[in-house]
Amino acid sequence: YNPASNQCQGF
């Protein structure tokens, strides 16, 4: 999980 790629991942 990369916080720089702001996608809806559910983390």
From Swiss-Prot:
Keywords annotated in UniProt: Disulfide bond, Protease inhibitor, Secreted, Serine protease inhibitor
Q: What is its main location?
A: secreted
Entry GO terms, CC: extracellular region
State where the protein is found: Secreted
Does this entry carry the keyword Secreted?
yes
Tissue distribution is:
Expressed by the venom gland.
Give the transmembrane region(s): none
GO molecular function list:
serine-type endopeptidase inhibitor activity
Q: Where is the BPTI/Kunitz inhibitor domain?
A: 1-11
Role this protein plays: Serine protease inhibitor that inhibits trypsin.
Which family, according to UniProt? Belongs to the venom Kunitz-type family.
Q: What is this protein called?
A: Kunitz-type serine protease inhibitor C10
What is the taxonomic lineage of the source species?
Eukaryota, Metazoa, Chordata, Craniata, Vertebrata
